[in-house]
Amino acid sequence: MTGVQTCALPISLPNELDKNRASGPVWNGFLAAQVVLGPRVLFGIGTVAQLLLPASSGTKKAYDKHHIFPSNFLKGGPYDYARDRRANFACVDYQKNIYISDDDPKVYVAKYRAALGDAAYRTSYEENALPYGFEDMDYLKFLRQRRVLMSRW
């Protein structure tokens, strides 16, 4: 490859997604990619872009940053320290976040899979950078795989 210089910089985007809190430039970059590419929110029909629009009235946002493995589900367990990792968040509409509550992912995913059907369920996974079958994964394995999928957006 003539004229092309290479650099030994580490690939750091997946590592940046390992930090706590769904905020900052890396999280905002992920959201921006979702806005531009147009996927639907997790298990929903509205797009991320639609839910991020400023509300015409009222004080409640149309979307929530949902803990995929709910915070209270992880609280007090061996992964309590990692419950707010960026890779553990997805945009959901406000009502779905209330419905999911603090349920084990195995419980709430089964409900949405039955309601959506297999094709829409798989699409929702892909559009939200979720490893297929995450609800059956060890939490740390889920975080590792999701960081890689998110960094591809």
Please name every model-derived segment:
Residues 1, 5-66, 73:
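Intrinsically disordered, low-complexity N-proximal targeting/linker segments that flank membranes
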Residues 3, 83-86, 144:
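Short, solvent-exposed loop/helix junctions and linker helices
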Residues 5, 10-11, 69, 87-90, ...:
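Short acidic (Asp/Glu) and glycine-rich catalytic loops that position anionic groups and cofactors
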Residues 6, 117-153:
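C-terminal, well-folded lobe of enzymatic/effector domains
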Residues 28, 44, 61-64, 85, ...:
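Alpha-helical structural motif
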Residues 56-88, 104:
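Histidine-centered nuclease catalytic patch
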Residues 71, 96-99, 115, 119, ...:
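Hydrophobic alpha-helical segments
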Residues 85, 89-114:
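Short Cys/His-centered divalent metal-binding micro-motifs
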